[in-house]
């Protein structure tokens, strides 16, 4: 059963799922988890089962501990990646299996290092976007920056989400299953119109290679990597780093943190406040206390000795 649970993850949903996998999927659906979260959690439990070659309901606390050590020491996953795996296993054991022990005690979350993202300057963003040669890829990556969208949100846009009358973009079912509106830049609108005139997409603003499906995040990531190579920028560039740049550039231009929180779709203001640590204009505009110290009087050179 363990192999079957793991092997079905990549198969299409019309195929038969194991009862255990079906039950976990239903547990997430009734709690209104996003589709991305459901797929991520199912994949993490699948990887857990494959690691031991057993059905996950046959595994216990010691197996979980062994798996955590494996993820950290052998796979050398980043804390964020381990967080996702632990969140999935916590849900599986506490909700789907209804284990009587507390998963939070057995599955401690690793402490995340407070690393600051590397931020592109406005000139670097402009140079990078100029290196995205494909019209569709240029349009979607420009949207990630101009509207501050997550890549998962950008790929799900529909033509009807672009409201040129109110000059807003509707972001439907973003992270946390919350809709929101973000600004529609006149420059972005012009780029989107130029792009839309060519294929005239109907269902998805950025359709993928598969009929009836949007462009995949992997495809956008590959286009981003190709443009980064062409740009020869020393800083790393991903679709998410364009979103980071959007937030920091707004903050440096004088936008308040609360407005940026609404635009980014952050649930907590504390998440948005992290960008205060990155906005360099705030740092550069603050004088060092060293400047307040009085300048020492110049020391005269030593007098030459008199010999006669």
Swiss-Prot record:
GO BP terms: DNA integration; DNA recombination; establishment of integrated proviral latency; symbiont entry into host cell; viral genome integration into host DNA
The entry's keywords: DNA integration, DNA recombination, DNA-binding, Plasmid, Transposable element, Viral genome integration, Virus entry into host cell
Alphabetical list of PROSITE patterns matching this protein: CB (PS51900), TYR_RECOMBINASE (PS51898)
Active-site residues, record numbering mapped to chain: 150, 175, 240, 243, 266, 275 (o-(3'-phospho-dna)-tyrosine intermediate)
GO molecular function: DNA binding
Superkingdom in the source lineage: Bacteria
Coiled coil: none
Tyr recombinase domain boundaries: 115-288
InterPro entries (UniProt xref): CB (IPR044068), DNA_brk_join_enz (IPR011010), Integrase-like_cat_sf (IPR013762), Integrase_catalytic (IPR002104), Integrase_recombinase_N (IPR010998), Integrase_SAM-like_N (IPR004107), Tyrosine_recombinase_XerCD (IPR050090)
Domain Core-binding (CB) span(s) in chain numbering: 15-97
Segment forming the signal sequence: none
Task of the protein: May function as an integrase.
PANTHER family with a match to the protein in the record: PHAGE INTEGRASE-RELATED, PROPHAGE INTEGRASE INTD-RELATED
Family: Belongs to the 'phage' integrase family.
Protein name: Putative integrase/recombinase y4qK
């Amino acid at each position: 059963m363990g192999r079957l649970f793991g092997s079905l993850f990549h198969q299409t949903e019309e195929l038969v799922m194991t009862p255990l996998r079906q039950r976990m999927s239903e547990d997430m659906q009734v709690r209104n988890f996003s589709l991305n979260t459901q797929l991520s959690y199912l994949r993490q439990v699948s990887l857990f089962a494959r690691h031991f070659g057993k059905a996950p309901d046959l595994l216990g606390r010691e197996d979980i501990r062994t798996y955590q050590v494996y993820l950290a020491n052998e796979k050398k996953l980043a804390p964020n990646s381990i967080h996702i795996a632990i969140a999935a296993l916590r849900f599986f054991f506490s909700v789907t299996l209804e284990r009587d022990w507390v998963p939070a005690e057995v599955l401690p979350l690793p402490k995340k290092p407070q690393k600051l993202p590397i931020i592109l300057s406005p000139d670097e963003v402009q140079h990078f976007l100029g290196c995205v040669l494909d019209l569709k890829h240029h349009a979607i990556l420009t949207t990630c920056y101009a509207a501050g969208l997550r890549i998962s949100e950008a790929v799900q846009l529909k033509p009807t989400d672009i409201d040129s009358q109110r000059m807003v973009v509707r972001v439907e079912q973003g992270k946390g299953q919350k809709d929101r509106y973000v600004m529609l830049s006149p420059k972005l609108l012009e780029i989107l119109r130029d792009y839309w005139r060519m294929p005239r997409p109907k269902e998805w603003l950025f359709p993928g290679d598969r009929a009836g499906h949007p462009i995949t995040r992997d495809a956008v990531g590959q286009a981003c990597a190709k443009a980064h190579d062409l740009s020869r920028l020393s800083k790393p560039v991903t679709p998410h780093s364009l979103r980071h740049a959007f937030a920091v550039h707004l903050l440096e231009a004088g936008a308040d943190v609360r407005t940026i929180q609404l635009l980014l779709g952050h649930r907590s203001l504390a998440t948005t406040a992290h960008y205060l640590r990155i906005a360099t204009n705030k740092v550069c505009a603050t004088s060092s206390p060293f400047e307040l110290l009085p300048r020492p009087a110049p020391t005269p050179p030593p007098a030459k000795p008199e010999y006669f």
